[in-house]
Amino acid sequence: MIPILYANQPDFEAKFARLVEARRETDSNVTGQVTSILHSVKTRGDAALVEFTQRFDGYGLASDADWQISLDECARAYAELPEDLREALDLAAQRIRAYHEAQLPENRDYVDASGVRLGAIWRAVDAAGLYVPGGRAAYPSSLLMNAIPARVAGVERLVVTTPTPRGEANPLVLAAAHIAGVDEIWRVGGAQAVAALAYGTDRIKPVDVITGPGNAWVAEAKRQLFGVVGIDMVAGPSEILVIADAKNDPDWIAADLLSQAEHDPTSQSILITDDAGFAAQVEDRVDVQIAQLATGKTARASWDAHGVVIVVEDLAAQAPALADRLAAEHVELAVDDPEPLLHAIRHAGSVFLGRMTPEAVGDYVAGPNHVLPTGRRARFSSGLSVLDFMKRTSFLGLDEASFGAIGPAAARLAHAEGLPAHAKSVELRLK
């Protein structure tokens, strides 16, 4: 049985605090291994990529054709999809693109009361690297969620790296790459791929920003290379918090909880409800549904290790504070009127409003990005957006009159800070 925490019990605060503080990131000590891989790629370039790709993926980068997946191959993968699946990917891409186009910031250019011209210009980075995992996490939706905002932002060069164990590439991922319009796809994965994107090699030219999910080695590589390049975030295991009253169908809520549990054994699913009987019904339905899932083994491991049910007396009064402390990646508000909860909860990666808005629809076709902060990082960070592929340059301009209005204050502050050259730069113009 998974833990059930009752908010009215004396030991609730201690138990909830342990839940908040628990870490689910992989405990493997990968830091040293990743440091070694990064150094090897930085110093040995393509030769290191050949070695690591053979060792980890069982794939030889022997000839030029072995290194890249052609854009023609991506186009063929798209054309060969079943029509209904092709239409679903197209719909997802259209909605993702429309949502992110609405995020584009506006440049500013104005003259203030002192006559100083001020403003800012937004520009896209030149090149972005998109990491696409192989194996269990080879999701075409993730490629769309990373590549489309970059293209909307105006990035000119989109580079995908993806491991292809034994040379096999996921055709759905290739089809998504065709839809998103990526420019290059390299058959390289792991920390070594992140290093290649950051440092560049003879074959793979460096990029400015790296985004995309990956395993512990990929996440650690991004962490270590932040500053050499920009990154989206250091992501951990997926998580969902469902706030639900007893008016819900317990089957629906059970399925929503399992939508994250099936991702990985370290994923976490939490239910907050104000009805203990409903909580028991949901638990029963979780057990039934796990037995029906092809991903049941993973979901069972996740639910048994990290699933939690919290029973409160008043959802409106108690759930927001608990949700803020959890700062979950996904928060579902399965109640009649989710608006008060939406505005009361300050820390969440993405919020899903009402009984007809399961998290799964946001993963694919709603439009908002599904690359979201995990591990309580929603307290200080946001989901992926066009801004992750852009930077802002401020500008200012003064004439003689406006310089006379504000220059003396600048000189006084420079003297106060003990920087006479700064002061002289201003004072010479004031004479």
Where are these regions (language model features)?
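A glycine- and small/hydrophobic-rich beta-loop-beta segment
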Residues: 259, 263, 271-348
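Glycine-rich phosphate/diphosphate-binding loop of Rossmann-like nucleotide-binding domains
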Residues: 141, 152-168, 244-252, 256-294
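N-terminal Rossmann-like NAD(P)+-binding subdomain of aldehyde/semialdehyde dehydrogenases
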Residues: 1-125
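Conserved NAD(P)+-binding/catalytic subdomain of aldehyde/semialdehyde dehydrogenases
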Residues: 181-268
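Buried hydrophobic positions in well-ordered alpha/beta secondary-structure cores of metabolic enzymes
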Residues: 45, 128, 150, 214, ...
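Short acidic-hydrophobic, aromatic-tinged amphipathic segments that line or gate anion-handling sites
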Residues: 3-8, 184-189, 308-315
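Conserved small-residue-rich beta-alpha loop and adjacent elements
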Residues: 110-175
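C-terminal core of ALDH-fold dehydrogenases
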Residues: 324-431
